[in-house]
């Protein structure tokens, strides 16, 4: 068996659609207000995909930027992983279209449907595949068009979510000398499928006139349960990193952009200042699997990824699933 290799992130990318949907726009659509949304979520606007865009469209933009950042030709990619719950279609995998349109000839591809935790889970899969020597160049995308599964008559969900994509290129660390993967976790609490879900369209509730009439094709969420769960596991994940590495090693925490109030409550529970956290939820809302890679790229652009310091990425969401990835930049 080959020796385990160190793995790094060679390139980062992000893309968000041009159309902006503000809280003021939503005031005209549902019974809500800018004040109500901001107080409860910290969100002021979100992006909405154009009618002629699909999830792979967004991912391809982000993937291309990540490849350019990594100085890697598309044909050198060996594997494409797409984290999404809003793929172009139920099957085949959206990763197949991403790889094809990017020009990743002969690359493998598959999707990971872990919702808000998807990108973090995908980073661990990619890192371990590169570490094992099975692959040298892996592209991981997190992409969502959540606006297509939102009920714009339900103010409890439609104000929270937006569309977007992010991407990262993984390769042996000796070739990129940055973003070294140090480890992470993947966990779940099963039996809570109904807390946050799109009930219709699968084998439990196949698509039918009846399922559409019952609005099962739209996202459903139990907000209070999600809030409590997210605060608890966010705090648990960051505390585990502190126990292993020490708080002084942390340069930035880039969490899943779930809700500003959840992030603030978790940081208060941990006892760390919000200055350590990179947040952009005010601009994009919750973009599920896209939120961490979008924020990671923007943190890079803002100079928040400090050389030699830890980048901690906790994520949590539907399933109920959670996990984290730790990098040393």
Regions found by a protein language model. Name each.
Residues 1-51, 154-228, 232, 236, ...:
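Condensing-enzyme catalytic core mediating Claisen C-C bond formation in acyl metabolism
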Residues 2, 56, 60-63, 67, ...:
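Claisen-condensing/thiolase-fold acyl-transfer catalytic domains that form or cleave C-C bonds
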Residues 10-13, 83, 113, 138-144, ...:
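Short beta-strand segments
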Residues 20-21, 91-93, 149-154, 322-326:
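Short acidic, glycine/serine/threonine-rich loops at helix termini
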Residues 30-39, 89-103, 140-146, 203-211, ...:
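Acidic-glycine-rich active-site phosphate/pyrophosphate-binding loop
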Residues 75-83, 248-256:
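Short glycine-rich phosphate-binding loop at a beta-alpha junction
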Residues 131-165:
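Flexible, glycine-rich active-site loops centered on histidine and acidic residues
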């Amino acid at each position: 068996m080959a020796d385990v290799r160190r793995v790094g992130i060679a390139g980062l990318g992000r893309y968000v659609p041009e159309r902006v949907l503000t809280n003021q726009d939503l005031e005209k659509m549902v019974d809500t207000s800018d004040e109500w949304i901001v107080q409860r979520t910290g969100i002021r606007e979100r992006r909405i995909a154009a009618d002629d865009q699909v999830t792979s469209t967004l991912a391809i933009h982000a993937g291309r930027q990540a490849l350019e950042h990594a100085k890697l030709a598309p044909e050198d990619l060996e594997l494409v992983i797409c984290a999404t719950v809003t793929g172009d279609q139920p099957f085949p995998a959206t990763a197949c279209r991403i790889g094809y349109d990017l020009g990743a000839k002969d690359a493998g591809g598959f999707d990971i449907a872990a919702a808000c935790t998807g990108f973090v889970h995908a980073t661990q899969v990619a890192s371990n595949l590169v570490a094992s020597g099975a692959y040298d160049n892996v592209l991981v995308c997190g992409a969502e068009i959540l606006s297509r599964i939102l009920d714009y008559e339900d103010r409890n969900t439609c104000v929270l979510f937006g569309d977007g994509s992010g991407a990262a290129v993984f390769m042996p660390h000796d070739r990129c000398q940055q973003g070294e993967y140090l480890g992470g976790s993947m966990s779940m609490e099963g039996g809570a499928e109904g807390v946050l879900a799109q009930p219709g369209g699968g084998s439990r509730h196949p698509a039918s006139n009846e399922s559409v009439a019952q609005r099962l094709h739209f996202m459903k969420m139990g907000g209070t349960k999600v809030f409590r769960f997210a605060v608890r596991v966010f705090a648990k994940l960051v505390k585990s990193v502190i126990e292993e590495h020490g708080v002084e090693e942390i340069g930035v925490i880039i969490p899943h952009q779930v809700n500003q109030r959840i992030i603030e409550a978790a940081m208060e529970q941990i006892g760390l200042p919000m200055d350590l956290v990179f947040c952009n939820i005010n601009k994009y809302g919750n973009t599920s699997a896209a939120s961490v890679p979008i924020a990671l790229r923007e943190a890079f652009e803002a100079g928040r990824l400090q050389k030699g310091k830890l980048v901690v990425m906790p994520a949590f969401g539907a399933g109920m699933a959670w996990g984290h990835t730790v990098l040393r930049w």
